[in-house]
C-alpha cells in the first residue's frame, strides 16, 4: 500500500484565479501568442525571475532580454544566448521557460525522462536536483550571479546584467589568456593569485560601480605608496592637496576589495538560486491547473464509477501523460486514468467512515514538468 500523501487541498477555481493574479508579475508576457506589439511571436523567459541583458538570437528574432528576462521567438525555433560577445548557450529549443538546465543537449535530454518518487509517481524535481549539481551547470550559474549588478541576487529578484558590465566584459574578452571553460573543476574555475582563471581575469576587468567612481580607478602601485610622504601627526599640518602614504594604502585596499572573484559565489549559492528559480516555474505551471473538486463524499452503497476532471484556467487541459494512485485502495480504488480526456476514474470499495486520497500526477504539453493535485474521497452512510 502506498504511503499516505499529506497535502493541503488543491486550489478551487476561485482560489486558483487569486493565485494567478498574485503571481502575475512572474507571468508577464510569458506564454502569450503575441509580443504586445501586434506581432505573432511568442514570448519566452530565461528563469522565473529573469536574467536581463542577455543577447539572444533565433532564426527570425534577435535582441536583448528585457528587465523581466524575456525574449521573442516563433514556435519551433532554437535559441542562442550570449553575455555580450561570450556565447553561453546555443541550439536551445525556444519555449516559454528556458533555464540553465536546458542550455546543453545532455541535460535537456535527461530532463525529458522523469524520475519516480517514493509514491511511485513520475516527477521532474528529482531529475532537476540531480542535474543542478553538475559542474558545468554550477560554474555557469555562479558566473551569471557574479555578473549581477549588485553583489548578491536577493530573494525575489532576478539577475541584472547591465550594459556597463557588458561593455567592460567585451573589452576584456580578447585579453584573456584562455577562453572561459565552464566544464573545468570548481577549483580551477576559481583560481586566483598570480595565475587567475579566465573567469577571474574577466571579473577583475569589470567595475560594478558607476563610471567615474573611485573604485573603478587603477589602484595606487606599491612604488607610489612607498614614495608618498607620511601623514603628519598633527591634523593642522595636513595638506589637502597631498596624497599621503596612508591615504594611498587605504585607497588601494578599497579598490582591490571591490574586485569580484568567483570564490565569492560557491556551488551551494548556485544550487540555492537555481532551485528557487526552478521551483517558482513549477509553481506557476501548477497553478494553471485544478481539479473540478478537491473533496468528494460518496455513500458506501454507491459503488458506481466516479470521475475527477483535470482542468486548466482559461483553456483546455492538454496533457501528454497522467498517472494516479490511491493512498487507501481498500477504501477507494482506481478504475482508470486517461491523459487524452484529462480525467481519473475511481469507485468506493470500503465502508462508511473510510477515506482515501487520490494523488494525480500529470504532464502538461510543451513542458517536461509534472504537476501534482490531490482529491480527498470520504465515504459516508
Residues of each region from the PLM?
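C-terminal motif of bacterial Sec signal peptides marking the signal peptidase cleavage site
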Residues: 26-29
